[in-house]
Amino acid sequence: MRKAGRPVWGGLGARIVKAPRALALLLATVIAATPLTFAQPAAAAVFPDDPADPVRAAEYWLDSLGVRAAWQTTRGAGQTIAIIDTGIGSGPPEFQGAVAGGTDVSGIGSSDGRTPVGVVDSNHGSWVASLAAARGTANGTGMVGVAPEAELLSVSLGFGSSATVPFVEQVANAIRWSVDHGATIINLSFTTNTLAWDPLWDSAFEYAFDNDVVVVVAAGNRGSGTTRVGAPATIPGVLTVAGVDPQGNASVQASTQGYTIGVSAPSENLLGVSADGRIVQWSGTSGAAPIVAGIAALVRSAHPDLDVANVINRLIETARPAAGTDPLLYGAGIVDAAGAITATVPTVTENPMGSLSEWIRVYRRADAGPVPDQTVAPVEIDALPPADAATPARSALLPSRESLIYGTLP
């Protein structure tokens, strides 16, 4: 049985934020006016957009990243985003008609993946999903995701002693299930806070890449006890997303740094739809990743001929300069939805985020093939003295998920 440390949600833990009073009052009014029962909205082929709606007005990234401009071309129709997280709530109207399927890989959730798993972080999957592809409510109001015409898959994960399946196996199973059920983009808003990953993930991520699925991963948060990216954000071929504040500066609390960062997206003052329908404000690269996953869905919808390498390359090549220039913090820059769809970008033959197959060939030497026959006699040396006893390693996950607290507006 494989064992692994508990993950840190992705934002790797959304952190408590103190909302400006005006925004808090505005959202409190919206939340108070939200009914406790959820009606099935009428099906519609077109999603109206009212920028004056208080919730839509608070979604600043729709304009700053060129998402509304991109909607003139596509809203993500024909694409499926798998949210591998704590599960997407089944009640909120923003998700009605958006979730095409789901499953649980933890052994403690529901078979459809729609029952939120976890006590402290059970809303996390719903927050993430709402940024990627929430469909709003009626008449262009309510929270809308970046790709509101894309479909979602809800795959619920569990942790530690509560789950009946080791976390490493859960992730591998979740990726394979998502690929087999039509995902074109997979979003992973969690980290293990370690650079290395279990070999079981090698074949799972290769399976996604071999089946032309874009995998978007949150870089992680400084506030969760780490300053550098950790797996799965270190796996070659994934698109790792760092976080910036509304002004385009690297987020001090909500983004780590590392060579594997591809692009940046907003990670502060984000909104999310909770599993019970409440709208909350939160921060973390857990939110930056699904914004980029949604934009990847827009690109794939507008350019259905592009493979994974060229979707990721288009996002990287059209990224706008950030407030700073350090690629360890920003990657190629801040993702630009409109540019990624309309710009002329030469095609590539290799994924700019690297090749997992090549990494495995070089670094998983145990699987590199048989050892060549000896050509000379080996040299014998004296045996080495006994080694000292190993010192137990400290936990790579700081803090543990139990110490992370999610915040809502007063």
Description of each model-found segment:
Residues 85, 220, 284:
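Active-site glycine-centered loops adjacent to acidic/histidine catalytic or metal-binding residues
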Residues 230-301:
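Extracellular S/T/G-rich loop segment that most often corresponds to the catalytic His/Ser-adjacent loop
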Residues 71-81, 88-101, 115-167, 256-260, ...:
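Subtilisin-like serine protease catalytic core
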Residues 2, 25-26, 33-78, 93-94:
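Protease zymogen maturation seam
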Residues 77-80, 149-151, 180-186, 210-215, ...:
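Loop/turn elements at helix/coil->beta-strand transitions in domains of secreted/extracellular proteins
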Residues 11, 15-33, 406:
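Sec-dependent N-terminal signal peptides
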